[in-house]
Amino acid sequence: MGKTDGSSWFTAVKNVFRSPEKLIPRRINRRQDNDLVEEVEDELHQRPKRRKRRWLFKKVSSDPCAINVGINTTSTAINAIAAEETEKTVSPAAKETVFFCRTSVYLKRHVAAILIQTAFRGCLARTAVRALKGVVKLQALVRGHNVRRRTSITLQRVQALVRIQALALDHRKKLTTKLGDEISYSHAFSKQMWRTMEREAHSESELEDKRPSRLNGYGYQETGRRMSTDQAIVEPVKIVEIDKYNNTYSHHQQLNDQTPRGNSFVTRQAHSIPNYMSTTASTVARFRRPQSVPKQRSNRTCLDNNEPRLRLVRKRLSFHNDNPQSYGYIAGDGYFWYDIDKRTNAHEDFQY
C-alpha cells in the first residue's frame, strides 16, 4: 500500500515528533542488529540475503513460517546425507589422525579439569579444616569457661565452709573461756569468802583473847568464847558435870554445915576437883599448899556488864542476895559466887 524506501508520510510524521539527537543512534543500532540477524540466518540456512525489513501496515500471514519450517527440515536432512557420504569417502589414516588429535585435546581438557577440581577440593578442605579448628577452639574456650566457673563455685563453697568452721571454733572457745572464767570467778569468790570468814574468825579470836580472863571452879582460866562448835562439844560435858556436881553440892552443903566458916574454901576446892586430876602431882601439891593458888582478881567491869544476866538467873533459880557486897558470874560449868567481906569463894551448880 505504501512505499518501503522510508519516504512515506507516516515516517515523516514520526520523524517530526522524535528528537533529532536520538534519531541517528537508534537508526544505526537498528541497522546493525538487522545486519547481524541476516548474516546469521544466511549462514544457517545457506541462502542469499533477504531484503531489509520495512514498516508494513498489514498483518503477517502464517504461510511464511510454515515455509521456513519445511526449509529447515530439508536442510538438516541434506546435511546428514552429506556427512555420511564424506565419512565413506575419507581414508582410515585420516580417521586415525583425527582420533588422536581429538584424544590429545580431550586428555588436556581432562587433566585441566582434574587440576581445577583438585585445587577447588583443596580449597574446600582447607576452609573445612579452618572451620573445624575454629569450632574446636570455641569448644575449648567454652569448656575452659565452664571448668573455671565450676572451680570458682567449689572454691567459694570451700571458703564458706572454712568460715563457718572458724566461727564455730571461735564460739566454742568463747563458751569454754566463759565457763572457765565463771569457774575461776566462783573459786576466787569462794576463796575470798573463806578468807573473809577466816579473818573474821581470827579477829573474833583475837578479841576474845584480849578480853579479861576469869577463873572457873577448878582454878583455870577460861575466856568468853561462844562458838557453835564449842557449845556443841561442851554441852554434853555440862550435863555430866552437873549430875556429878549435884552430888558434890549436897555433900558440900553437909560439910559446910558441920565445919566452921573459915575452912569452907579449902573443902569446897577439894570437892570441886574433877576425878581425872585427883592422882596428879599438881593436885597433891595444891592440897598441901593451898596458899599457892593464884590470886583471883575481881573484874569489876565484867561483873557490872553481867549484872542484868545475873539478876535473871537469880530470879529463875530463886537465889536471894542478902549481901549487897557479894558478886557472882556464870562459869563454864556452874555459878561462881564471890563475897567481898568474907573473902570466900562459893561454887554453886545449876542446870538451865
From Swiss-Prot:
Gene it is expressed from: IQD15
Function: May be involved in cooperative interactions with calmodulins or calmodulin-like proteins. Recruits calmodulin proteins to microtubules, thus being a potential scaffold in cellular signaling and trafficking. May associate with nucleic acids and regulate gene expression at the transcriptional or post-transcriptional level.
Subunit note: Binds to multiple calmodulin (CaM) in the presence of Ca(2+) and CaM-like proteins.
IQ domain mapped to chain residues: 109-137, 138-160
Region (Calmodulin-binding), start-end ranges: 140-164
GO CC terms of this entry: nuclear envelope; plasma membrane
Comp. bias (Basic and acidic residues): 200-212
Disordered: annotated segments: 200-227
InterPro entries linked to this entry: DUF4005, IQ_motif_EF-hand-BS, P-loop_NTPase
Similarity comment: family membership: Belongs to the IQD family.
Keyword set includes Cell membrane: yes
Name of the protein this chain belongs to: Protein IQ-DOMAIN 15
PANTHER family: IQ-DOMAIN 5-RELATED (PTHR32295), PROTEIN IQ-DOMAIN 15 (PTHR32295:SF122)
UniProt KW keywords: Calmodulin-binding, Cell membrane, Membrane, Nucleus, Repeat
Top-rank taxon, per record: Eukaryota
Subcellular location: Cell membrane; Nucleus envelope
Example of a GO MF term: calmodulin binding
